[in-house]
Amino acid sequence: MHPPIECRAARLTDAPAYRRYVAECGAAGLPLYQVAQFDPDQWLQELLAHADGLHLPPGYPPTTTYFALEGEEILATLRLRHGDNSATRQWLGHIGYETRPTRRGEGVARTLLGWLQRHVLSEPVLISCDEANAASLKVIAAAGGQWLDRRYHAGDRCWIRFYRLAPAKGPGLSSRQ
């Protein structure tokens, strides 16, 4: 039996767990983590700076990173982009997430996204995914995502589905929690 999953914002003290997470995700071929493998500690520092609007990739809004953890292990990562711009509206959406490859199919992404809806979101956001990603489509459906449209993303050469995702019923916290 697994210990309970804790969902929270990323911290610098997560660096040892993040190194292990990055190594596994990079080895599995996740492009973001293939880059992060070169210096995971610096990558984590950059992610934390993104929450304050610092060192952002061009066109990206401030972005807070959240982890789903089991003890000292990161099971999933979620990035919440704050605010609207052409990137969030046209292809990026407000939310991006990945699950540790060895923990896929266990409901971890669903848990982290549901936690975000209950504890962080204060207004609806856009969430998008490659329409060939059946697991992500199931996670978004389970979270109550309302289908908006489908667009071709030339850079990734795939069709992206866009959904509206609302906060869960009940009190929400600050969007920067």
Walk through the language-model features, giving the residues of each:
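Alpha-helix N-capping/helix-start residues
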Residues: 12, 110, 131-134
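GNAT-family acyltransferases
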Residues: 1-94, 98, 119, 154-177
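Conserved GNAT acetyl-CoA-binding A-motif
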Residues: 120-131
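Conserved acetyl-CoA-binding loop-helix of GNAT-fold acetyltransferases
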Residues: 96-99, 105-118, 137-142
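Conserved active-site alpha-helix within GNAT-family acetyltransferase domains
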Residues: 132-149
